[in-house]
Amino acid sequence: MTLAKRIIPCLDVTAGRVVKGVNFLELRDAGDPIEIARRYDEQGADEITFLDITATSDGRDLILDIIEAVASQVFIPLTVGGGVRAVDDVRRLLNAGADKVGINSSAISNPQLVFDASQKYGSQCIVVAIDAKKASDGRWEVFTHGGRKATGLDAVEWAKKMQNLGAGEILLTSMDRDGTKIGFDLDLTRSVSDAISIPVIASGGVGGLQDLADGVKVGRADAVLAASIFHYGQHTVQEAKRFMADQGIPMRLV
């Protein structure tokens, strides 16, 4: 049986509000995280991803209070990332109600964290987020700290390493496409999807429903993540699911 592909609305959170930017900059307020999460749950989203986008660069603590509030009202899986620096942070987020924990900058500075966390809590709980930008040599380079810090690492090779260390899923964001609404970087998505066996979530650049379908059909992603098209009422999750199902993509329709 073919696994259904997933639609995952993404809530970028800073200072307790949901925001959306372009190329990781120019942030615009999109609303209250608890209200928005509840709306997506009602619309039939498969999961919700929360990213505290300035926790690492600001050195702030985890957004446990928001996660507890959302988890008490939302009954689909929650992935939470931002500011995860230690195995104990993973524990605290899971205890607050997260189903999966995203690790990004800390996976670079301390790859052992991915191994230790997946050993303790299971690979199914650990999502490694990779923010990648096209380099002049044609590769994709990994960036950290909300896209502000270049690492010199090749995104495809890094995804392989993270799989080997125990990541259960890769959340792959094209920084070049983030917020641009011109579609996923399908070459990047396909290159990573073909290189690893764990699920890849495509992120960055969705401007319409065809972009979501292309992420799966062309990019070979297992799930597609979007923010702007859902936050500002351009489309609902149900519309997106019906559109993808009409193109022959297996979806969980509610």
Curated annotation (Swiss-Prot):
Subcellular location: Cytoplasm
The protein's Enzyme Commission number: 4.3.2.10
Active site as annotated: D12, D131
Top EC group: lyase
GO CC, any one term: cytoplasm
Pathway where this protein functions: Amino-acid biosynthesis; L-histidine biosynthesis; L-histidine from 5-phospho-alpha-D-ribose 1-diphosphate: step 5/9
Gene Ontology molecular function: any one: lyase activity
Gene3D superfamilies xrefs: Aldolase class I (3.20.20.70)
Reaction(s) the record says it catalyses: 5-[(5-phospho-1-deoxy-D-ribulos-1-ylimino)methylamino]-1-(5-phospho-beta-D-ribosyl)imidazole-4-carboxamide + L-glutamine = D-erythro-1-(imidazol-4-yl)glycerol 3-phosphate + 5-amino-1-(5-phospho-beta-D-ribosyl)imidazole-4-carboxamide + L-glutamate + H(+)
CDD domains: HisF
Biological process terms in GO annotation: L-histidine biosynthetic process
Primary site of residence: cytoplasm
Signal peptide positions (record): none
Keyword annotations of the record: Amino-acid biosynthesis, Cytoplasm, Histidine biosynthesis, Lyase
Superkingdom of source: Bacteria
Quaternary state and interactors: Heterodimer of HisH and HisF.
Role according to the record: IGPS catalyzes the conversion of PRFAR and glutamine to IGP, AICAR and glutamate. The HisF subunit catalyzes the cyclization activity that produces IGP and AICAR from PRFAR using the ammonia provided by the HisH subunit.
Annotated family: Belongs to the HisA/HisF family.
Protein known as: Imidazole glycerol phosphate synthase subunit HisF
Organismal lineage: Bacteria, Pseudomonadati, Pseudomonadota, Betaproteobacteria, Burkholderiales
Gene of this entry: hisF
